[in-house]
């Protein structure tokens, strides 16, 4: 899958789950399970409940996502 095929959408973190996973509520009303991307883990960027984040999703599985940016 090419990087251009991904879907980027904003949402807010609703719940912290074990093992660096988060329940994110998207703008369109869907809830997805998301994990941090590798660069955010390396830079120790903290994500808390209520943070607005940008997630990247595959068009093949719309129930999982990757957090790629945390709004300031």
From Swiss-Prot:
Major site of localization recorded for this protein: cytoplasm
Compartments (UniProt record): Cytoplasm
InterPro entries: NA-bd_OB-fold, RNA-binding_domain_S1_IF1, TIF_IF1
S1-like domain: residues covered: 1-72
GO cellular component annotations of the record: cytosol
This protein's UniProt keywords: Cytoplasm, Initiation factor, Protein biosynthesis, RNA-binding, rRNA-binding
UniProt record similarity statement: Belongs to the IF-1 family.
Entry protein name: Translation initiation factor IF-1
Organism, scientific name: Protochlamydia amoebophila (strain UWE25)
């Amino acid at each position: 899958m090419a990087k251009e095929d991904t879907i980027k959408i904003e949402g807010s973190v609703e719940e912290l789950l074990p093992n660096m996973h988060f329940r994110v509520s998207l703008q369109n009303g869907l809830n997805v399970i998301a994990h941090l991307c590798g660069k955010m883990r390396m830079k120790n960027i903290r994500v808390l409940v209520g943070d607005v984040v940008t997630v990247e999703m595959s068009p093949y599985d719309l129930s999982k996502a990757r957090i790629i940016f945390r709004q300031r």
